[in-house]
A protein has these predicted regions:
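N-terminal alpha/beta PP-like core and its mobile active-site loop of ThDP/TPP-dependent enzymes
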Residues: 26-383, 425-428, 508-511, 531, ...
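Active-site diphosphate/adenylate-binding microenvironment
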Residues: 56-68, 72, 395-469, 474
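Thiamine diphosphate
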Residues: 145-158, 356-357, 365, 372-373, ...
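Phosphate/pyrophosphate-binding active-site segments
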Residues: 179-182, 220, 343, 347-436, ...
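A glycine-rich phosphate-binding loop feature that marks nucleotide/adenosyl-phosphate handling sites
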Residues: 207-212, 437-440, 592
Length: 634
């Protein structure tokens, strides 16, 4: 491309002298870099014909208000901008949106430089661990360096190229710094390639220098032509498929570990067909839960540390484990002590080679749906030995008693009884969600998900503070669903400000706050490793005055409809009224911090101190060493 002579400087200095391959350069349009970015976002479609970027969350500051703020205002009718109260939780809402949409759509989040940007680092890590797409657009310092150091700029004495946004590098799947307007011509396609590639999916960070946002450039018009990003469905390698088929055919007691990739691939129907044809039972991870309905005969339920006895018993005896779309984190594998059959083989079907080859597994790199279909064809005639029908009957005979409504009495309700009350109030369109604290374990064990997409758990990063913002994101993704968020008082105190955002926007969902007056889950873990109760429950923290937080009043002050209940019966009555409420509906109930579901579960490696003056710790250390030895000799 050539510039008009009247506008051209010394040709060797022309920033547009480089012609990019694959981009038609005949016609151009002059835009600021920020305008070019938002125009490009609006032209990127998914294979269903919807804009891949559904909207932009924004908190403006000096690092993005003049450039991106002006550009977003210009497209506000086609690319909506949403205002939140905290950069981290805005990003949580965006990530939850994408997770509930099974990665077919995503959102962007923009902040100013400095603290606004670093607030999003936790959310980037959450998306990175969970393999979820989000486009992060933190403002950055001046590319010209003329006004250095600008307000909120980090100065590295030994590296002049560093800014606060370098914090995003280890928690981004793709990171770029836009310090020239033309950088967008390569950075944006790379960003969308990352967000739409099942094997490489995750957060993208484009650190956008604030002066460059406002700088104009003659962009090729062809750059803004609509583009459809198709979901790549990797087919299995013939050799890997043959080896996996041979291993499965040799197995008599195989089990499938269904992970989140089953949902993201849209493979739930393929999974059901596969297990029914070959009589292979499944165990569900937190991300994979609801891949099959809870009452399907071959769904053994939750696996691992927060798992149930049916799945864990079968996994311990299995002679082959077929992981499908799972990261095999320690809560799933019992710190690799669960799959204890010494003759056990492992096959991992995953789009990412990194996950497919973990712990010496036999890799089957493939899209989950396609991989299951091709495995099914190759396994014609194969059926595994039957699994005892009594396993699930016995399990639910135990745990259903824990979720029953209590009789009359003054005892505080348990978290299990709260789960039971919500279960009785739920229906087929209900989505329950959570992330951290006590409830992820109880929900994994106890919740009966009736169909795919009815269970939304962020348990990769297990980030306290995801819940309220995440519930809002889920409801924005699927407005017709009945969204119920479980959160403890500890998580609520960490991040609750998007309650006001939801109230302002009229986004309706239900929040059940179980108030056990502290970090009850970690208090139990502390006791379980021999530690004294210390600094977890509020009564065990340094204080002069007892804590007495009125969560219902606090939620109401942010615009929510709220109620405090004192019993399971009152909780059920309150939940029955949730359909009458517009905006967030908060129900608070006090619970006992000590009980949890003792049935099921498996060993989890939490290092216990080798030296302690407490006999309780020494006793737990001895048990820990025995467990380590058993795990390492299996």
């Amino acid at each position: 491309m050539r510039l008009k002579p009247s506008k051209m400087r010394n040709p060797t200095d022309c920033p547009q002298r480089h012609v990019l391959k694959g981009i038609k350069m005949s016609k151009t349009i002059r835009l600021t870099a920020a305008q070019a970015l938002v125009r490009y976002l609006g032209a990127q479609m998914n294979e269903g014909g919807e804009p891949f970027i559904a909207g932009v969350w924004a908190i403006f500051g000096h690092g993005n208000v003049a450039g991106l703020g002006e550009a977003l205002h210009g497209v506000r009718d086609s690319l909506p901008t949403y205002r939140g109260h905290n950069e981290q939780t805005m990003a949580h809402a965006a990530i939850a949106y994408s997770k509930q949409m099974r990665r077919t759509r995503a959102m962007a989040v923009t902040s100013s430089i400095g603290p606004g940007a670093t607030n999003m680092v936790t959310a980037a890590a959450l998306a990175h661990v969970n393999r979820l797409p989000v486009l992060l657009l933190p403002g950055d310092v001046f590319a010209t360096r003329g006004p250095d150091p600008v307000l909120q700029q980090i100065e590295d004495f030994g590296d002049g190229t560093v800014s606060a946004n370098d914090c995003f590098k280890p928690v981004s799947r793709y990171f770029d710094r836009i310090s020239r307007p033309e950088h967008l011509l390569t950075a944006l396609p790379r960003a969308f390639r990352t967000m739409t590639d099942p094997a490489d999916c995750g957060p993208v960070t484009l650190a956008f220098c604030q002066d460059v946002q406002a700088e104009a450039y003659d962009y090729p018009e062809s750059f803004f032509e609509p583009r459809v990003w198709y979901q790549r469905r990797i087919r299995p390698d013939e050799g890997e498929l043959a080896r996996a088929v041979a291993a499965i055919r040799a197995a008599k007691r195989p089990v499938i570990v269904a992970g989140g990739g089953v949902h993201y691939s849209g493979a739930t129907d393929a999974l059901q067909s596969f297990v029914e044809t070959h009589n292979i039972p499944i165990a569900e991870t937190q991300a994979g839960k609801s891949a099959l309905a809870w009452d399907h005969p071959l769904n053994l339920g939750p696996i691992g540390v927060t798992g149930g006895q049916p799945a864990n018993d079968i996994c311990a005896e299995a002679d082959l484990v077929l992981g499908i779309g799972t990261r095999l984190q320690d809560f799933t594998t019992g710190s690799w002590g669960l799959f204890s059959n010494p003759e056990r083989e492992m096959v991992c079907l995953n789009t990412a080679a990194y996950d497919a080859e973990k712990h010496g597994a036999m890799p089957l790199q493939s899209d989950a749906r396609v991989g299951l279909e091709e495995l099914g064809v190759a396994l014609q005639g194969y059926r595994a030995d039957p699994v005892a029908d009594t396993l699930k009957v016995e399990w639910f005979g135990k745990v259903d008693k824990l979720t029953d409504a209590p009789g009359d009495g003054n005892a505080l309700p348990t978290d299990m009884q709260v789960v039971g009350a919500v279960q009785r109030a739920a229906h087929d369109d209900t989505v329950v969600m959570c992330a951290a604290g006590t409830m992820p374990g109880e929900l994994h064990k106890l919740w009966k998900a009736p169909r795919p997409g009815a269970y939304h758990m962020e348990y990769g990063f297990s980030c306290m503070g995801y819940e309220i913002a995440g519930a809002m994101g889920i409801k924005m993704a699927q407005p017709d669903r009945d969204v119920i968020c479980f959160t403890g008082d500890g998580t609520y105190m960490m991040a609750n400000s998007e309650m006001a955002t939801a109230a302002m926007m009229g986004v309706s969902f239900t929040v059940v706050i179980t108030d056990n007056r502290g970090f009850g889950c970690i208090n139990r873990l502390q006791m379980g490793t021999g530690g004294a109760e210390f600094n977890n429950l509020l009564d065990h923290a340094v204080h002069e005055n007892p804590s007495a937080i009125d969560f219902a009043a606090h939620a109401a002050a942010m615009g929510a409809t709220s109620v405090k209940v004192s019993s399971i019966a009152e909780l059920e009555d309150a939940l029955a009224k949730r359909g009458e409420v517009t905006g967030p509906y908060v129900v608070v109930i006090d619970t006992d911090p000590y009980p949890s579901t003792e049935y099921g579960g498996t060993w989890w490696e939490v290092a216990v101190p080798e030296v302690s003056i407490r006999p309780e710790v020494n006793e737990k250390r001895a048990a820990y060493e025995v467990a380590i030895k058993e795990r390492n000799t299996k």
